[in-house]
């Protein structure tokens, strides 16, 4: 009995994950308004009844895609953190990781698109922005402690500036070049942002730091 | 005869403008996918046939809203240019003007929303970004000449960074605060961007410059 119960629960978890993947594909291709519950059910190979058992509305589903995207991004962020040996390196690796994921992971691409989609105004989507602002602010705080970032800066202010600037770089890269120049745009953005915030001893390091924002050798 | 002809043409121009206004209202409220030609015709008080006489598709209409928004923004930009007495002041006044328009002019709000709407991928919308990058780059070039901006910077690079950063600030302000904090976000953004690019003699002027980005006394 207990094992049956667990198996059923595991199956439900797997179905839920498959639905989120299918929904991500639809949202990524057709935007929020262009996606229907019918299309998601069909893509996931489920009846509409089975879909509604897991998600009661499209807004609910979009919220789950954004939450999943944020979870995937956070995991990658933690992995990125282990690549960097200083706060600024970690910040660069996180930028690299987010860009890489945006290009390669449909759930990330879909989550980011939903997060900037006017039509998705009713969807829960504020947390990713405010969470990343906190992450960036914390790294800036560490950067100040490590003597990499000028202590005159308020870490919270830098967090509030960096996250929207990053968001805009990916939006404009999407509109102008289908994200083909995303790494270039991010390296240019960080070249300017770092020039504003680093201490004099870190200034010569800016080209080395921004060069970390590039496709990994393992990427196509 | 000639006079009749002109009258008919003037009427056509007025109808076209009324359609663009109606479309802007619909796009602003419902996004690209959520807007129908029927709703635009109804809002403009026209038959669908009359609407199609002027615009052959929704993408055509969205392109016209973006073009009109860009025209309005450029006009305001030129007016803003006359308020500033130095290149950096002009850059700040332009930022103020764009923010003010985004809040007060439906066609601008709608145009910007269409310009960042994933669902509007088929719509002509690259020009506003590339045009503003050129405008910003030209002001940076003038700022270098005037000794306000460090000559080590490539004006084109700064243009490519500033415009997406500005775009992202408005997107995030829209998502997090319905644009209520747009001026605050822009002042913070420029505090960082100016710190990166100004010459040492202009550094003490940064607070005065960013303070120009605020609601005008004539605004509500």
Task: Please state what every model-predicted region is.
Chain A
Residues 49:
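Key DNA-contact positions within bacterial/archaeal DNA-binding proteins
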Residues 96-153, 157:
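Short secondary-structure transition hinges
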Residues 72, 97-101, 105, 165-172, ...:
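Phosphate/oxyanion-binding loops and surfaces in catalytic or ligand/nucleic-acid-binding neighborhoods
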Residues 18, 89-97, 157-164, 184, ...:
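Amphipathic alpha-helical interaction segments
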Residues 1-30, 34-46, 59-63, 72:
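Basic, helix-initiating cap at the start of DNA-binding domains
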Residues 64, 75-108, 155, 159:
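Hydrophobic alpha-helical connector segments
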Residues 2-3, 130-134, 138-146, 176-220:
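C-terminal peripheral helix-coil segments that are non-catalytic and often amphipathic
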Residues 52-55, 59:
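A short His-aromatic
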């Amino acid at each position: 009995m207990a094992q049956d119960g667990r198996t059923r629960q595991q199956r439900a978890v797997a179905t839920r994950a498959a639905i989120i993947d299918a929904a991500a594909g639809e949202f990524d291709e057709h935007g929020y308004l262009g996606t229907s519950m019918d299309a998601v059910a069909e893509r996931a190979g489920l009846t509409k009844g089975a879909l509604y058992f897991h998600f009661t509305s499209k807004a609910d589903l979009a919220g789950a895609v954004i939450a999943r995207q944020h979870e995937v991004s956070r995991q990658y962020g933690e992995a990125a953190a282990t690549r960097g040996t200083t706060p600024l390196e970690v910040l660069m690796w996180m930028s690299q990781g987010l860009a890489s994921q945006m290009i390669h992971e449909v759930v990330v691409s879909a989550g980011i698109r939903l997060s900037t989609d006017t039509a998705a105004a009713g969807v829960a989507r504020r947390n990713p922005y405010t969470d990343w602002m906190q992450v960036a602010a914390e790294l800036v705080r560490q950067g100040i402690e490590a003597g990499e970032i000028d202590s005159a800066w308020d870490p919270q202010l830098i967090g509030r500036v960096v996250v929207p600037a990053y968001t805009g770089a990916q939006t404009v890269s999407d509109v102008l070049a289908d994200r083909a120049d995303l790494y270039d745009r991010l390296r240019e953005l960080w070249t300017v942002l770092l020039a504003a915030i680093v201490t004099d001893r870190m200034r010569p390091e800016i080209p080395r730091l921004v060069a970390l924002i590039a496709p990994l050798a393992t990427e196509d």
